[in-house]
């Protein structure tokens, strides 16, 4: 059964600040059938990978249940200072400043096929940084899966060397 996931995405104008047209995934998360459909779709795309990686925080919402559905490991990518123990850091530039992402040491192994799962592809900057982290660990980015792609922001261009799949495309 096909479900039109776009009807579960609410647009909130001027949030979190004026001029932003925020895509709210809360209605999708609040509907068990739509959420299940989303996870099953993502799992069908990620079935051949070794591990699933997701960024803090909304990548966790889709990456973790997808990994559990496939009985695969889920690895968290977090902002600096949020993971215990020894971590690998990756600094990257944003449009207005810089940021640091972290992953716990030895969570991503050389040769592993990785799927990155996140909620929204906007400018692509954060996910591009995650691809570099994965490749620095010697692993292979096999797929990048998003719930929503905001096509007008052209984030796909930053990820043109990867297999990028979006369940919903909004122009």
Swiss-Prot record:
GO terms for molecular function: adenine binding; adenine phosphoribosyltransferase activity; AMP binding. Transmembrane segments: none annotated. GO terms for biological process: adenine salvage; AMP salvage; purine ribonucleoside salvage. It catalyses: AMP + diphosphate = 5-phospho-alpha-D-ribose 1-diphosphate + adenine. It comes from the Bacteria. GO terms for cellular component: cytoplasm. The keyword Glycosyltransferase applies. The keyword Glycosyltransferase applies. Gene3D superfamilies: 3.40.50.2020. Pathway: Purine metabolism; AMP biosynthesis via salvage pathway; AMP from adenine: step 1/1. InterPro entries: Ade_phspho_trans, PRibTrfase_dom, PRTase-like, UPRTase/APRTase. Belongs to the purine/pyrimidine phosphoribosyltransferase family. Catalyzes a salvage reaction resulting in the formation of AMP, that is energically less costly than de novo synthesis. HAMAP family: Aden_phosphoribosyltr (MF_00004). Homodimer. This is Adenine phosphoribosyltransferase. It comes from Mesomycoplasma hyopneumoniae (strain 7448).
């Amino acid at each position: 059964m096909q479900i039109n996931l776009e009807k579960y995405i609410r647009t909130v104008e001027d949030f979190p600040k004026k001029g932003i047209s925020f895509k709210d995934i809360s209605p999708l998360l609040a509907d068990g059938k739509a959420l299940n459909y989303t996870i099953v779709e993502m799992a069908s795309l990620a079935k051949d990978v070794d591990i699933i990686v997701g960024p803090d925080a909304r990548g966790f919402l889709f990456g973790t249940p997808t990994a559990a559905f496939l009985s695969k490991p889920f690895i968290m990518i977090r902002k600096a200072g949020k993971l215990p123990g020894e971590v690998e850091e990756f600094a990257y530039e944003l449009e207005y400043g810089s940021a640091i992402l972290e992953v716990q040491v030895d969570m991503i192994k050389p040769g592993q096929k990785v799927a990155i799962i996140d909620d929204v592809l906007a400018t692509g900057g954060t996910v591009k940084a995650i691809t570099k982290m994965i490749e620095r660990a010697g692993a292979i980015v096999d797929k990048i899966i998003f719930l929503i792609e905001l096509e007008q922001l052209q984030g796909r261009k930053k990820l043109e060397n990867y297999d990028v799949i979006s369940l919903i495309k909004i122009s």
